[in-house]
Amino acid sequence: MSHQKILILDFGSQVSQLIARRVREQHVYCELHPYDVSEAFIRDFKPQGIILSGGPNSVYEAVDWRAPQVVFELGVPVLGICYGMQTMAEQLGGKVESSAKREFGYAELRARGHSKLFQGIEDRTNAEGHGLLDVWMSHGDKVTELPAGFKVIGSNESCPVAAMADEERGFYGVQFHPEVTHTIKGKEMLARFVHEICGCGNDWNMPDYISEAVEKIRAQVGDEEVILGLSGGVDSSVAAALIHRAIGDQLTCVFVDNGLLRLNEGAQVMETFNRSLGVKVIHVDATEQFMGHLKGVSDPEQKRKIIGREFVEVFQAEAAKLPKARWLAQGTIYPDVIESAGAKTGKAHAIKSHHNVGGLPETLNLKLLEPLRDLFKDEVRELGVALGLPHDMVYRHPFPGPGLGVRILGEVKKEFADLLRRADAIFIDELRAADWYDKTSQAFAVFLPVKSVGVMGDGRTYEYVVALRAVQTQDFMTAHWAELPHSLLGKVSNRIINEVRGINRVVYDISGKPPATIEWE
C-alpha cells in the first residue's frame, strides 16, 4: 500500500521529532530527513506536502543551511516553522534580520487575513473581535520584508510578521512552534495543514501497518530463521510479537535473566510469549555469571559495560546453538534511528542502522531485521495492543538496559537485588491500586548501600535504606517529581518496612530534572 506522505526537512531544531509525532498522530505518514537531501530524493519521495523545521542558525549567517530549491518548485504545500519560515522568506526574495527584541517562551499572537491555516482556530478574541492565539516562540531573528505574493496572517508587537502565507501556492510560515504543547492550538494547525491544505487522508493506522509489516518481513526473510534478544521491554516484546505473526516458528527468542530483572519478570515473559503466544523462547538463567563479574565493582559506567559485555557473551553462546539463524532481529524504533544519525551539526544526518545490542550483528555475521524502525514509541505501544500483548506489558514504565544494576548504588550483590525487586514491586502495586501508575511517567525504587538505625518492636535495628522515585514528564528531557499523596507514600513505606526484611527506612526523592537525572546512576 502506498501512503500519502509528508516530508519533514530538519534544520537542527531540538524538537524536530515532535513535528513528526504530531503529523503521525493525525494518521498521516511522514519521515524526518536532513535539510540537505538531494533533489532526486525529494522527487522520489513524492510528498503531499513539506514541512521545514526550526533550527539554531541565522539565515543571513549560515548561507549553506537552505532548503533545496525544488521544495518550492514541486507544486505541493510547504509549511516553514521558525527557521523554516525564515529560510522560506529569504529564499523566495524576502528579508530576514536580527530582532532587537528576542522572544523565548509564551507569546500572544493576533491572527490576520482570514488564512486557511488559522481560519476558525483561536484561543480567544479581543475587544475588537480579532482572534488571538497563545503560542510558543523561540527566536532572535525576524522577517522584515515579505517575499512577493505573501501576506501577513499573524503578528504581535515584537514580531510584526509572526506568520505569513502565499495561499495561491500553498506556502505558509509561522515564527512560533506549533509542534510543542505550549502552543495551545498547535495540534489543530498541523492537522489543518496536513489534511485540508495538503489533502492527506487518514491512511496511516495500525491494522494496515500490521498487514504491510507482515508481508514485508516474509518477503525479506523468506524461509530463513531469525533470532531475537528478548528483554521483556516494550520494543523487543512488540518486535517479537510482530515477527512471530509473520513467520511463526522461524523466530527464536533468547531471554537472558541476568539476576537484575523486576520481580517475577522472567516468569511473566515466558507466560506471555511461550505459553500464550506460542513463541519459541530460550530462557537462560545467567544470574551467577553476571553477579560474579559485577563483584567489587562500584562505578556505574563500569557496571553498564560489564552487563552489556556479558549479555553479548551469553547471547553469542546461545546463537551458536542455532546454526540455521541468518537474521538478528532488534527492537530499534524511529527515535533510535534519528538519534544515531545525529551529526555534529545537530541535524539528523546520514541515517544508518542503529545497533541497540552493541556489536552483535558484526560478531555473529547475521543480517539485521528491524521491523519497528519507522515507528515512534506511542505507535509501538499501539501496535503491541493490536498484536494481543497484555496492556500492562505494553504500557509499563521504562526500565534501564542494565536493569537493577544501576538502581543498586555501588556494588551489586544478589542480596541487594532481592531486597530491591521486592520493594520496587510493592511501590508499583500501590501506585496501580491508587490509580497513580498511569499518572506518572516513570516510578521505581533505588537501593542505597547505607544502613540506618531503627526501632522495630522492642528492638533496635540497623538495616538498609531504599529511595522511591516517581516523575512526570512529556519527553524525558526534563521532568518534575511526582507529587504523590502523603497517604500513598505512607502506605508504601509501611508495607516495604514490614514486608521486606532488611529495610528499615524509606525516603522519597523530590529532585527535578534538571538538576538531577531521572535514574540515580
Swiss-Prot record:
The record's SUPFAM superfamilies line, in alphabetical order, gives: Adenine nucleotide alpha hydrolases-like, Class I glutamine amidotransferase-like, GMP synthetase C-terminal dimerisation domain
> Where, in this chain's numbering, is ATP bound?
S231, G232, G233, V234, D235, S236, S237
Does the record's keyword annotation contain Nucleotide-binding? yes
Question: What positions belong to coiled-coil segments?
Answer: none
Q: Spell out the catalytic residues.
A: C82, H177, E179
Instruction: Write the Enzyme Commission number(s) for this entry.
Output: 6.3.5.2
Gene3D superfamilies per record: 3.30.300.10, 3.40.50.880, HUPs
- Enumerate the UniProt keywords alphabetically: ATP-binding, Glutamine amidotransferase, GMP biosynthesis, Ligase, Nucleotide-binding, Purine biosynthesis
Q: What is this protein called?
A: GMP synthase [glutamine-hydrolyzing]
